[in-house]
Amino acid sequence: RLTREIYEVLSTSRGASKRREKRIDKLILGYYTPQRIREIKRTWKDSDLEPHIKKILGQALEAHLRGEYALSIACLSTMWEGLIHHKLHITGRYSQKKTGRDFTELIKENDLKPVFGEFYEKLIVCDCNTVDEVVEGIPNRNGVSHSKYKKYPNKKASLNAILIADFIIHLEPKQETEEHSNGQTENAQP
């Protein structure tokens, strides 16, 4: 239903405009009702994440439902990289560059378009050194971590933070591999 309605807006619009963006935002924000957010919370509870991580994520969703969007965004944006590491079976220190590269590979392994990885690299974990670099509605981890806010974050930005986390949580994990002393890898036995 939502996809059909968005296509309707796209097909009846004369091109990219603020009006079209607002119409699409209204559809998406209307679709993600408090009930749908609670459904997301239930699916996260059923995930393979550690109980304390599930609790943190659940509290971020509750903050969103209460209209405390800054809390939701601040929490979730700092969790994304850890969630990605969980999917990649990374337990130690790992560079952001390698994480981004391996995340893009994981997205491909899940038969999804690489644009999701590019979105993550270019808008989510990229540097945000000034308030002017903030893109409204898109929660940038670096910007959030360093208080680069033009104004109080809105519901759209909070929902985007939730949907990014949900996207990561629902990816199939990377096939575990074993690295041999010669640097070669092969699939590990379960």
Model-derived features: positions:
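Charge-enriched, short contiguous segments at helix-coil
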Residues: 125-190
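Alpha-helix initiation and N-capping motif
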Residues: 21, 37, 100, 116-117
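Glycine-rich, often proline-containing surface loops adjacent to acidic residues and nearby aromatics
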Residues: 37-43, 53-60, 140-147
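Surface-exposed polar/charged interaction patches
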Residues: 12, 30, 34, 47, ...
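Short runs of predominantly hydrophobic/aromatic residues within well-ordered alpha helices
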Residues: 25, 57, 73-76, 80, ...
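Amphipathic alpha-helical interface elements
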Residues: 43-107
